[in-house]
Amino acid sequence: MSYRKLGRTSSQRKALLRDLTTDLIVNGRITTTEARAKEVRKTADKMITLAKHGDLASRRKAAAFVRNVVADVKEDGDDIRVQSALQNLFEELAPKYADRNGGYTRILKTMPRRGDGAPMVILELVD
């Protein structure tokens, strides 16, 4: 199994992929370098596939990878409902992609980064 090292140690690389995958789940799109986006695409597809399974084991595997961050806050009068990234993954993204077999993300190339000329892309979830 091949992967990109991204110029980091294994723990730093895993933390980077966890952060970027969580940001993609929460926001729906992220701007990053092309190499990072290609790696995040793999992990994001795996997380959405786990969410589509929907069982307890899949939820625990996804919870071990996705960061525990607030995805959305909704107010209904006196009630405040806080939705985490994991809830967003299982309650919104899994039903959205129920009929799709993979390919949940899209990479759009943008201008190179000013400063070092790194190829930048927008990684977004397909509608």
From Swiss-Prot:
Keywords recorded for this protein, A-Z: Ribonucleoprotein, Ribosomal protein
GO molecular function list: structural constituent of ribosome
One GO CC term on file: cytosolic large ribosomal subunit
Superkingdom in the source lineage: Bacteria
Matches recorded under InterPro entries: Ribosomal_bL17, Ribosomal_bL17_CS, Ribosomal_bL17_sf
GO biological process terms, semicolon-separated: translation
Family label: Belongs to the bacterial ribosomal protein bL17 family.
Quaternary structure note: Part of the 50S ribosomal subunit. Contacts protein L32.
Name listed for the protein in its UniProt record: Large ribosomal subunit protein bL17
Annotated gene: rplQ
